[in-house]
Every structure is written in C-alpha cells, then in structure tokens.
Amino acid sequence: MPLADFHRSDPFTLGIELELQVVNPPGYDLSQDASTLIADVQHQLTVGEAKHDITESMLEIATGVCRDISHAQTQLSAIQQAVQRAALRHHLQICGGGSHPFHAWQRQQISDNPRYVKTVEHFGYLAQQATVFGQHVHVGCQSGDDALYLLHGLSRFVPHFIALNAASPWFDSTDSRFACSRLNRFSSYPDNGPMPWVADWQGFRRLFRQLSYTSMIDSMKDLHWDIRPSPQFGTVEVRVMDTPLTLAQAIHIAGFIQTLACWLLTERPFKHQPDDYLLYPFNRYQACRYGLDGTLTDVRSGEQRSIRQEILQLADRLAPFAHQLKATAALEAVVRQAKSPHSEAQQMRDFIANGGSLSGLVQKHCEIWAA
C-alpha cells in the first residue's frame, strides 16, 4: 500500500489513546471479554471510541481531535464512564498500568481482526506476549517536514516520557527490577526503538517504500517505532508511555508532550543529525530500568544528569508555551512529579512489600481507575 499524503492538521491539536486492562473479579486475572464490552459501549459514545487491541484482554479508548488538554479530558472522562458502566453490567473491571502482574501470556486470545491475525503470522508468540498496555499521544502538524522535525525533537525526550509514566514493574508474577518492563516485550521486533534516520518528508517516502519491500509493512500501523509520523491524521504519535493508573496522569503527560511540541516547532532549538541517536538506546534503557532516577548522558559533551533534573530544568523554558496552550496545570503536575520520590512503580512495590498480594494490587488499580 503506498504511503498516504501528509494530511495538514491544525498545529498542536491533540489525540490520546489508552490501552486498558479488562479483568475478572474476584481473582483479577485478565479477562478475554473486550469484544463484549466494545459491543455494549460503542453505540453509546458520542465522542471518541472504544475499540480492540491485539488481544481480548485489551480495550483501547481514544479521543477525537482535541483543541487542548481540557477538551481531551472531557472526552476521555465521558468514554471512561461509559466503559465503567458497561463493565459493571458484565461483572468485569477496568484498570490502568503498563502490565498485568501475573497473567499467562499463553492464554491470551488474539482479537478477531485481519490485521492482528497477520501480526500473529509475522511475530508468532511475540504477539501474545505483547499483551501490555500503553498510552499514545498524537500532536497535529501542518506538514510532513514539520512532522519529521518534531519527531526528531521529541526523540530527545523519550526517556522523560517513559520515566514519567513508568507503571509496569511486575511481569509474570515477578518484580522485574524495571520501572517500565513493558517496552522489553517489543525488544525482538525488527522495528523496535527509534525510526531510522531521515531528514525530511521526501526521505521518509523513500524509507517507507524500502520498508514495504519486506512484505511485513503494508501501512504505518505495521511500524512499532517509539515515535512515528501518522500522515493520515497529520500527526506525530508518541508511543513509549505505559498506561498510567489515573486519567489525570494521562492528561498531564499529554499536556507535557504538547507543550514540548509547541516549543520545538516554534523555536527550532536543535539542528538534528544522525549522531543525535548514538546514545539513544542507553538513555532509553536508563528510563525503563530506573524511571525518573535514570541517568542521561549527553551525546556530545558526555555530561550526565538525572531525568528528574532535566525535567525541572526544562520547566521554566516551557512555561510560556504551556500558558499559550492552556496546559500550565499539566506542566505544573509534571514538575511536582519530578520532585516526588513516590513513583507509580515504587508504590506498587511498596504495596507488595507491606503484605499485599498481586491480585490485591490489581484490585487496588481497578479502584483507582474507577474513583
């Protein structure tokens, strides 16, 4: 399938997608009933959508095009409430978090969708192991060249995005020692990590054509890069975050990304080049392993700073752009989070250390999501 032309979007408009866990009380294992919920709820929604993801324990909710984070919050809240009502009718519960702490990937049923069936043909058991839960944020751009500049600019902050939403320390009933273990599930994918270097949209067209020769890539949806352009929507899509435990956190990270995008495209502070990505895997790993306590290394100077420090140093620079976008509350929340030692991943560990069970942890997450 040829690459679509880049659809011109209003700059800095937003779209948010959240992959949620569908669980069965009282044991709180993953359910295989996403289709039941979707059939119940899809005709009740007046904004956004609820749809399948790759397995039947995953429910994706998504906004439409939003002007600002307040608009996005209104849409997501309405969808959340409709899904909660449907879940109660079917004796199910919903929660956030980047991974379920004790599910068996072998029992996950692939959703009845031709694209997902093809994914299984390509990736085998890796597709079932991808029963993990992420947040994606789309930011509108006016052109393909703007989208490529923004993609490279936001790639500098991938560790920050991972660390702020890190909520998947438990996997396969084991403390992984990672703040975000979710991204490790994709490490065997041939397109894991950053997009290959291209400088402009013309170069991206060539790249997509070359990738299509593999017979694995029919559309942009078949690419699993950390950040990817979405020409059909006219956006850049950031894909590295765990789904957080609360809707508020999902809004805060979206506002932070939107504010960064506004700064990057307005001031053009960087001259992007391929060497920018030399230490990308190492800095990304630090965020996955240690969250906000991870250490970032500057690719040119060798200077090292914690992710917390970088976020706090960015805040003053971003403040006027947050004000412009009506995202000041989101930026302030991110700053508070960077100053706090109580990450979502650590709170999960503390719950278990204080005598809680893994099923009790999922129950708690369901209560948090429903609150």
From Swiss-Prot:
What is the E.C. number? Answer: 6.3.2.2
Query: Does the record bear Signal in its keywords?
Result: no
Against NCBIfam families, the record matches this protein to:
gshA_cyan_rel, PRK13516.1
List the protein's name.
Answer: Putative glutamate--cysteine ligase 2
Q: Which reaction does this enzyme catalyse, per its entry?
A: L-cysteine + L-glutamate + ATP = gamma-L-glutamyl-L-cysteine + ADP + phosphate + H(+)
Q: How does it assemble?
A: Homodimer.
State the Gene Ontology BP annotations: modified amino acid biosynthetic process
Function of the protein: ATP-dependent carboxylate-amine ligase which exhibits weak glutamate--cysteine ligase activity.
What family is this? Answer: Belongs to the glutamate--cysteine ligase type 2 family. YbdK subfamily.
State one molecular function term (GO).
glutamate-cysteine ligase activity
Q: Which Pfam families match?
A: GCS2
Q: List the disulfide bonds.
A: none
Going by the UniProt record, its keywords in alphabetical order are: ATP-binding, Ligase, Nucleotide-binding
The record's section on PANTHER family has:
GLUTAMATE--CYSTEINE LIGASE 2-RELATED
Phylogenetic placement of the source organism = Bacteria, Pseudomonadati, Pseudomonadota, Gammaproteobacteria, Enterobacterales
**Family matches, as InterPro entries:** GCL_type2/YbdK_subfam, GCS2, Gln_synth/guanido_kin_cat_dom, YbdK
